[in-house]
């Protein structure tokens, strides 16, 4: 069965979902029937074809009236401001991928269902009232048919949760801290300009900028046992893609750095193949651009202090890896059937 998908919001994640779908060869499993985006179709086609981070899209892209063509595949383009006006029932939409970054609560999900979609997947963290929050590779097997409004968590949650699970299963985590070193994002300024967050009034290309993060809440959403045992901070750096996460955890069992690396390397080759990767090459952030994994462990940076404090560095392409997980989760939701 081919899953009929609509994309609501055609920004960084929405466009990368399309590119990942075509580049990964999953068009027999997923068909995009519509895209809803307030911007004009000419701009949509141009930004899908030409991307500063990911290069030129190999597929032919063209726009004809209110249709976007990728190769010979026609995708209807919509410009609706209200979810209520979206023709999901008419288009036979199975799953809406809401990539707006704006919507994310149950009310918004219910609006998509009322418009005719069978299920909804948000590309960002949602409220506690959603049916499920999924980190693919860790808890996607818990999806059920009645889970109709789902969050795919965040790119950083998808990056760090698999590593936390591996370390906790092996050594027993007592507590931890996380520092996200994240590329600049659309909510920052090119030059100094007004923003409610005074730090984000400053030019993104000229400073390392501390920002708020809800990553600790994202960790406890997946692993409630870590409530009040993880803290997180985040800084934005003057790069346009790829993120590094510094994870430090105290564990119950004594361990050596070499043992931690062996554990993570084996997981990358085995149970987490395709989700977690492992490297000891002397790489820098740009080398992980367009990497489809949720997490790439940098084994050269693993440290252990006092046998119980583990520090690891984990990379991710915060756009491309996450877009691939959106596709994975879509198929996992569809596999549970539609009511």
Curated annotation (Swiss-Prot):
The EC number of this protein is 1.2.1.72
Keyword Cytoplasm among record annotations = yes
Catalysis performed (reactions): D-erythrose 4-phosphate + NAD(+) + H2O = 4-phospho-D-erythronate + NADH + 2 H(+)
Residues noted as binding NAD(+) in the record, renumbered to the chain = 12-13, 318
**Active site annotated at which positions?**
155
Q: What residues does substrate bind to?
A: 154-156, 200, 213-214, 236
* Pathway(s) per entry: Cofactor biosynthesis; pyridoxine 5'-phosphate biosynthesis; pyridoxine 5'-phosphate from D-erythrose 4-phosphate: step 1/5
Q: Which UniProt keywords apply?
A: Cytoplasm, NAD, Oxidoreductase, Pyridoxine biosynthesis
Say where the protein is mainly found.
Answer: cytoplasm
Q: Which HAMAP family match?
A: E4P_dehydrog (MF_01640)
Known partners and oligomeric status: Homotetramer.
The UniProt similarity line reads: Belongs to the glyceraldehyde-3-phosphate dehydrogenase family. Epd subfamily.
- Which NCBIfam families does this entry report, sorted A to Z? E4PD_g-proteo, GAPDH-I, PRK13535.1
User: Could you identify this protein by its name?
Assistant: D-erythrose-4-phosphate dehydrogenase
**Species for this entry:** Enterobacter sp. (strain 638)
